[in-house]
């Protein structure tokens, strides 16, 4: 049963569906624990990252890592990427953008950003929404 719930959650594609899913969970199991709420926010974070051209997102030890899509040059010239760069470079003590290197130290072409002092999934979601809308922090 748990696996089918996770699969259904993974298949959702918009906020309305997510809210309907949450309502069904509450109807079935009662009030959701904080961990379940955070899981719903993980889905929201994944959607937001897709919209921003972020292929992978990790939050570990209060550090948010955003791995950008390997894509054509259009993305690197986009308004969204420009907002990310502006945010990162205006906070050099907290953020940086770098390029991955292979075992021999050669660039792989994969770029990523790290942002320190992000404590929760909710915090990451709020921060990325602010970057996306150009409202900073």
For each feature predicted by the language model, list its residue ranges.
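Accessory helical-bundle/CTD segments and flexible terminal tails appended to RecA-like ATPase motors
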Residues: 1-137
């Amino acid at each position: 049963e748990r696996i089918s719930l996770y699969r259904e959650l993974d298949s959702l594609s918009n906020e309305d569906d997510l809210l309907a899913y949450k309502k069904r969970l509450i109807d079935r199991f009662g009030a959701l624990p904080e961990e379940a709420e955070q899981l719903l926010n993980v889905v929201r974070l994944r959607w937001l990252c897709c919209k921003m051209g972020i292929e992978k997102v990790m939050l570990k030890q209060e550090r948010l890592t955003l791995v950008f899509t390997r894509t054509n040059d259009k993305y690197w010239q986009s308004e969204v990427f420009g907002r990310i760069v502006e945010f990162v470079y205006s906070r050099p003590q907290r953020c940086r953008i770098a390029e991955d290197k292979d075992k021999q130290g050669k660039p792989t072409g994969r770029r990523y950003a790290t942002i320190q002092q992000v404590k929760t999934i909710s915090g990451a979601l709020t921060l990325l929404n602010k970057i996306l809308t150009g409202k900073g922090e």
